[in-house]
Amino acid sequence: MLGLIGKHLTIDMYGCIFKTLDDVDFVKETMLAAVKEGNMTLLNFTCHKFEPQGLTILALLAEGHMSVHTYPTMSYTAVDIFTIGEQSSPNQSIRVLKQSFKPEKIKTTNIKRGDVGSLSDMKPKIKLSTTPMRRVRDTSAKVFKFLSRSR
């Protein structure tokens, strides 16, 4: 077994509080708390505020990344957390995000990244068919034979 390379969580939060989703400082502090709670190391932070509302905030982590996209008019927040290694706990980060955004409904999807299973799983599974190549070769031979007779 080769093992798992990373954990990727996608979190959809529905029915969040409108005013918090357009507050850059609030979302930034929430993310910083989630990073800390998840035992992750912040390397860089960037955000963009859309007009008339909405945010995209990205945290570059030593272990991966965290992104938050807010849609205030829909009371919706989309979060991605990708981590590698065993020291981080992205599931702990979700608790902080839930406490802050207070969604009415949440959907979390866990994706195992890089889980290839065994070395044989990594080999490409390509089905080769010689029939098309044989047809090209046979057709070429027929054309060549035909052209040779014409002279």
Regions found by a protein language model. Name each.
Residues 1-67, 71-151:
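Polybasic/polar functional segments that serve as interface/processing modules
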